[in-house]
Amino acid sequence: MSTKDFNLDLVSVSKKDSGASPRITSISLCTPGCKTGALMGCNMKTATCNCSIHVSK
């Protein structure tokens, strides 16, 4: 079987690129009204509880 049989869009990374930062970072700034934090979202009573997720390129 050849390695060209399947194209999975994999990218090879060299060791010199090991200092790269993650592309997705998240910051949770929820108030006590958010029962379960950023994973479950905000409580209905506190729709603006300042939950946020930052995605960088």
From Swiss-Prot:
* Covalent cross-link site, Beta-methyllanthionine (Thr-Cys): 31-34, 36-42, 46-49, 48-51
Instruction: Give the free-text PTM comment from the record.
Output: Maturation of lantibiotics involves the enzymatic conversion of Thr, and Ser into dehydrated AA and the formation of thioether bonds with cysteine. This is followed by membrane translocation and cleavage of the modified precursor. The structure of the 2,3-didehydrobutyrine is not discussed in PubMed:15361862. It is probably the Z-isomer by similarity.
Which residues does the record list as 2,3-didehydrobutyrine (modified residue)? 25
Q: Cross-referenced Pfam families, in alphabetical order?
A: Gallidermin
* GO cellular component terms attached to this protein's record: extracellular region
Lanthionine (Ser-Cys) cross-link located where?
Answer: 26-30
What this protein is called in its record is Lantibiotic nisin-Z
Recorded source organism is: Lactococcus lactis subsp. lactis (Streptococcus lactis)
